[in-house]
Amino acid sequence: MPGEDEHQQWVVCEGVCATVAVRRAMLDDGARVSDVEHFEHCYRSFVDYIHDYLISQPGRWLRRLGPRNENVQPAKSSRWDVYHAVQATLAIRLPLWPPTAPALSRGLLDRPEEPAPDKKSWNFFGLRG
C-alpha cells in the first residue's frame, strides 16, 4: 500500500500528546514519579525524533518522511500541520483540561498541574455533579 511505510508528522505529534496526557493523568491519580518514568522516556524519544528529523529549520516541519527518515515530496501543507505541531510543542506546558486555546486564554501556560481558575468549561455537557 503506497505510503504505509512513511513517517508522518501528525502521528509523532499525537504520540507526544498521548505520552504527556497519560503521564499527567497517572500523576494526578496518585502515581509516583517512578511509576511514570516510562512515559517520560517515550516523551523524550518523540521530542528527540522531532528535533532530529521533522524540524528542517525554525518554524518549518517536514510533513512526511520515507522509511529511512528521508524527506518525501510533501503534500500540500494544511492548517492541521500547524495544529499538530503547536499541540505537541505546548502539551508538556499546559494542563490536561481545559483544551489548548482555553488553557492559554486563562493564563495556564507553564502551569500544567494547575486546574483552570474557573470551572465553567469543565462540564461541557451541561451536567451538574
PLM regions with names:
Residues 1-129:
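Glycan-recognition and catalytic cores of secretory/periplasmic carbohydrate-active enzymes
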